[in-house]
Amino acid sequence: MKQGIHPKYDLVTASCSCGNVIKINSTVGHDLNLDVCGECHPFYTGKQRDVATGGRVDRFNKRFSVPGTTKA
């Protein structure tokens, strides 16, 4: 392999807004500030909300549905 073509890996500290600090090897070269991490992200903590916003299909079905019929 050629010498000197590979990036230099440094020890970087990634700090989350929740206070979690993660030390990783990265080519970025400076410390990182994260908005969310695995400790505070709603998907991983189980505090996930179901956002049921009607889209174009729901609007179409509401506009062109036949009154008096029910969905099976």
From Swiss-Prot:
One GO MF term: rRNA binding
Organism: Yersinia enterocolitica serotype O:8 / biotype 1B (strain NCTC 13174 / 8081)
Function: Binds the 23S rRNA.
PANTHER family assigned: 50S RIBOSOMAL PROTEIN L31, CHLOROPLASTIC, LARGE RIBOSOMAL SUBUNIT PROTEIN BL31A
Database matches in HAMAP family: Ribosomal_bL31_1 (MF_00501)
Cited InterPro entries: Ribosomal_bL28/bL31-like_sf (IPR034704), Ribosomal_bL31 (IPR002150), Ribosomal_bL31_A (IPR027491), Ribosomal_bL31_sf (IPR042105)
Family note: Belongs to the bacterial ribosomal protein bL31 family. Type A subfamily.
Keyword rRNA-binding in annotation: yes
Highest taxon in the source lineage: Bacteria
Pfam families per UniProt: Ribosomal_L31
UniProt binding sites for Zn(2+): 16, 18, 37, 40
Record note on cofactor: Binds 1 zinc ion per subunit.
Gene Ontology cellular-component annotations: ribonucleoprotein complex; ribosome
Protein name: Large ribosomal subunit protein bL31
Any single biological process term in GO: translation
Description of how the protein assembles with itself and partners: Part of the 50S ribosomal subunit.
Lineage: Bacteria, Pseudomonadati, Pseudomonadota, Gammaproteobacteria, Enterobacterales
NCBIfam families hit by this protein: L31 (TIGR00105), PRK00019.1 (NF000612)
Cofactor: Zn(2+)
Keyword entries, A-Z: Metal-binding, Ribonucleoprotein, Ribosomal protein, RNA-binding, rRNA-binding, Zinc
